Curated annotation (Swiss-Prot):
GO MF entries: RNA binding; tRNA pseudouridine(38-40) synthase activity
A Pfam family the protein falls into: PseudoU_synth_1
Role, per record: Formation of pseudouridine at positions 38, 39 and 40 in the anticodon stem and loop of transfer RNAs.
Name under which the protein is recorded: tRNA pseudouridine synthase A
Subunit relationships: Homodimer.
Amino acid sequence: MNLAVVGYKLTLSYCGSGFHGWQRQGELPTVQRALEEAVAKIWEEPIPVEGAGRTDAGVHAKGQVASFAAPRKLEPEVLKRALNYHLPDTVRVWDARIVPREFSARFDAVSKTYQYLLWNDPVMDPFYLGRAWHIPRAMDVEMMNEAARLFLGKHNFAAFVSNPGMPVKNPVRTVLDCFFLEQGSLVFFNVKADGFLYRMVRNMVGALVKVGLGRLSRQELKKIFENQKRIEAFAAAPPWGLYLLAVDYPPDQES
């Protein structure tokens, strides 16, 4: 019996430490490869799986979204259990649902939210090793929040992209929300936008940490931003503090 092909939408989280990013890279361990291998075991054939965000090596996710089209073989709750059975423990599917087969986790997304974790204390909490960037010197988080407001709205983010040798076709993005929040020694940076350039969030964090440490003024950051050129005034924050927190879709695709 031929089963109708439907779309499947998955929401998943993963610890990025043991992966070379999301995207398949030959035989290297990647999240996409792990997910496609799990799907192939269930359907007994190779099926491509698409991700909303192509996270880099070492970057984590709390709310990555993936999609694929396949014959309707399992109900969503059964599919979720089957995928988690086949996936490594560092990848978990939290939600599975049936959507139109044309649904694209990547191209139908209207915004993404990333979170970056900083541990601001002379002594690093060992439980946050590989999960947060250790900044031993005290930071002025209020000043960092003031500088972060420069990013709000529609701007050219060419100064915050790291893509050696690759021209950026359209460096304009709209940042919808951008702020720091302190909880004890933990400092959270949340940023929501309609899209992100390569390493854009990590470059933003790298620059804002320099502001917080008094090594870069808000005016200097504003000048770098307006010049629209990547310079060596700041280094990108390391990947292990970054999390893909959530992906948003049009209301009719959220059900």
